[in-house]
Amino acid sequence: KQVQTPGGMWYTPVSGIWQTVWLESVPDRYIRRVDFCCTLEEAVLDVGDESLSGTVTVACPEGPFIAPLEGGRAVLRPANPRPWSPEDPFLYPVTIQAGEDRVESYFALRTLEIKTAGGRPRLCLNGAPYYFHGVLDQGYWSDGIFTPASPAAYEEDILAMKALGFNTLRKHIKVEPPLFYYACDRLGMAVFQDMVNNGDYRYLRDTVLPTLGFQTR
């Protein structure tokens, strides 16, 4: 939503490095990514390379357990699954060892789906209807525009919203650095992530036609 002539809902353009940048030395075969697909009982890990094998150590309250990493994937099943929610933001720390590479990460057990409850479709968290009470978060900072002065600023904003009774942030047309989402996961804040803008805007095409319909009584 950045234009050369800002006005209305269009913003002043900015530029520069606003995401995390780093240099990393890795072995020839390394863990390219860490993706989790979770249910309320298990998490399936994908490291992005089918040739990798190794181990995954999961920290649990009852003690750690080790699962094999085979074909770049691992199935992680805690003995006593504890679901994540804004009221109980429980995370499972994991250590992934594959060859000479080692990565530390985490996952949470959570489901989000639409189910019929009380005769109406409801947005459900972990199988039960849940009221997501949120605010719009545009990700601007008075001292850094798109970048906060410190990662601690993320936590301050999240905790301030929780203190006001909110459990959800709608991140508006901006993808934040991973530290923001980690803070939300750890502190118990749901995130509704907007897609970024990818073109021009036409009121008839983009607002009227997609919502045009007929109602009968």
Describe the residue ranges of each PLM region.
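Solvent-exposed loop/turn segments at secondary-structure junctions
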Residues: 175-176, 197-200
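Active-site-adjacent "subsite" loops/lids of carbohydrate-active enzymes
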Residues: 133, 199-217
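Secreted/periplasmic carbohydrate-active enzymes, especially glycoside hydrolases
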Residues: 1-191, 217
